[in-house]
Amino acid sequence: MKTRLAASLAAAVLAFAGANLAQAAQVSGAVGATGQGDMTYRIGVSFDWDKKWLESSTGYLTGYWDAAYTYWEGGDASGAHSLSFSPVFTYEFSGFTYTPYIEAGIGLAAFSKTDVGDQRMGSAVNFEDRIGFGLKLPGEQKVGIRAMHYSNAGIKQPNDGIESYSLFYSKGF
């Protein structure tokens, strides 16, 4: 069942990516740690929505689709893997050489197992909540910090949830 869920999510991510190849992609990498001190390594691809809402002299609201793979180191030396997909809203501030932005999003993640480090997730499919801050740099580059929380929202017990706090870098192609 877990393998089928992970395969379904992977197929959806690949289908989405294939449907958006005409758009410029951002490839990202992140290194972080969980609240329990285990390391996380994430690689992802994102596609900007190419839309602006609520434009003002302060900035504007926009967003992107994000698909990623994360490796979660475990305290018992057997790590976990996850595939995730999320819509992410960003607010980009105007009038700066390097554009600051904040981001927030809620998506889905499929884990290879329900025990991640010392945390018991209860289910292999979980919600992925994020909040972050970043800077857009020249050459379609971004750097920033991000906090992400994964849990099943109490749908199945136990629901310890897990957080990842990371530094990220992305580059457009």
What are the roles of these predicted feature ranges?
Residues 29-33, 63-71, 102-108, 145-149:
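Transmembrane beta-barrel strands of outer-membrane/channel proteins
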Residues 41-45, 161-173:
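Outer-membrane beta-barrel "beta-signal"
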Residues 33, 47-49, 91-93, 135-137, ...:
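Residue-level signature of outer-membrane beta-barrel architecture
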Residues 21-25, 50-61, 94-100, 140:
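Short loop/turn motifs that connect adjacent beta-strands in outer-membrane beta-barrel proteins
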Residues 30-31, 73-75, 116-119, 152-155:
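Extracellular loop and loop/strand-boundary signature of outer-membrane beta-barrel proteins
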Residues 43-45, 87-89, 131-133, 167:
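Membrane-embedded beta-strands of outer-membrane beta-barrel proteins
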Residues 1-24:
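Cleavable N-terminal export/targeting peptides
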